Amino acid sequence: MLNWTAGFLVLIAKLTIVLAVLLLVAAYLVWLERKFLARLQIRYGPNRAGKFGLLQPIADIVKMVAKEDTVPEGAERTIFMLAPAVVAATALLVFAVIPFGKDVTLWGMKIPLVVADLNVGLLYFFALSSLGVYGVALGGWASNSKYSLLGGIRGAAQMISYELSLGLAIVPVVMQARSFSLVDIVQAQEKYPFILTQPVAFAIFVISAMAEIKRIPFDLPEAENELGAGFHTEYSGMRFGLFFLGEYVNMQVLGGLVAVLFLGGWHGPLLPPVVWLFIKIVLVALIMIWVRGTLPRLRYDQLMALGWKVLIPLALVNIMVTGAWVLWMGK
């Protein structure tokens, strides 16, 4: 009974810490992105709220909380109100399987530095990321707006299309690590990160994941010059904030998965494992921000052609090459 109680308390503590860090980092990723883009465009960026604009995320949160929460006339009220929560919740729940370091011993208990050490962690990731499609599609449909509906349809088609190349990019990593567990995959990279043996899979995964979370240059579902704000055109206040939160938590999820699958996870010299993982996540986030400030938005036909005609065939070829290499190494 005592062990069960202690295990439950440890789980609650891990959930609380991970959730708090995710929300805090998401808020300051917005600040980092605005500052980084400002420098790229020879501007100052946020500099009014606090020193260097560091209080700007808090000011933004207060503003969104104070905004009126409106529901458009003719909207499907229940679905309209639930859709942002689906997007934010799926993004937050995916982080449960990302490991932060090796097991630690505390008060005589062996505690894994991961919320849920599943032996099918990658399948869990794909299951939850697939559910995120419903939040986008239903939010667009329930808004009773043509702009929102078109954005929702685009978002659903884009996310479903790029899930294929995303999944195929991970197959070579699983073949090398011989496991679906993210902890096992990190441990398999103790000698060298998989980016050295799987550069093609790394490139396909990063491009597909950016399309999956609808970041520029793949933000067709919310293209401002065509659709207003796409599937969240009719949202205001904290419901709009939940869509925003989902995007920036997804940036952290993408950074965590890239670090775990290709960059060696928590492995690194001198610094603690958790610090190494955090550095790698921030590095991936900075690359995404740099891409946003550098590349123009694709046309919708270019977006679909890239996924179906380039990434998926390339991923299939990479799987065959990796399979032959793993088979040869096994012999």
From Swiss-Prot:
Keywords: Cell inner membrane, Cell membrane, Membrane, NAD, Quinone, Translocase, Transmembrane, Transmembrane helix, Ubiquinone
UniProt-annotated location(s): Cell inner membrane
Stretches assigned to coiled coil: none
InterPro entries cross-referenced by the UniProt entry: NADH_UbQ_OxRdtase_su1/FPO (IPR001694), NADH_UbQ_OxRdtase_su1_CS (IPR018086)
One Gene Ontology term, aspect cellular component: plasma membrane
Record-linked PROSITE patterns: COMPLEX1_ND1_1, COMPLEX1_ND1_2
BP GO terms, sorted: aerobic respiration
Topological type in the membrane: Multi-pass membrane protein
Catalytic function, reaction form: a quinone + NADH + 5 H(+)(in) = a quinol + NAD(+) + 4 H(+)(out)
NCBIfam families with a match to the protein in the record: PRK06076.1-2
UniProt similarity note: Belongs to the complex I subunit 1 family.
Subunit structure: NDH-1 is composed of 14 different subunits. Subunits NuoA, H, J, K, L, M, N constitute the membrane sector of the complex.
Record protein name field: NADH-quinone oxidoreductase subunit H 2
Organism: Syntrophobacter fumaroxidans (strain DSM 10017 / MPOB)
Gene name of the encoded protein: nuoH2
